[in-house]
């Protein structure tokens, strides 16, 4: 069960023209040259997609990620960051990406999947294009003094002799999507996110489809 859709009064999606302008002008996407990708029901399915592409030799970690969302998906709310920082980081990096076990233990969901991807050392750079009307939800403990992401905990530091030091991930936040501009994507994915997006937002999936080749 994915839960009930939030009421329309909670969020008003951008209009079709704004969405298309963002895809073409800010992201450099083209209907004439669609990019491989996929549309999911929930955000965390991106992990399964990335893993499948890596196993097929089509995606090499670590890779850059551009995250366009109202939420950071870095575990601001429950269950928080502790499990990833204290349990996942103590494991051998090559043995961390056990998605089924995390889901079965109710540790992984769509509100924290990017934190897991960072802990898997899949991401080399993260750009977050957020809704300026949303609340800031980036856990401060994930950031270093320069504002980049540096995952660690007291217990994970003790394991650095075996696992190596966790990488520093360049992290950039765009509060105004018009200030963002980046092209050259290898893959484009989108989540319907019915727990967080009203039904009227589903039309954005239809707007995106001409720009991707579902794979």
Model-derived segments and spans:
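Conserved alpha-helical scaffold segments that buttress catalytic/binding sites
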Residues: 2-215
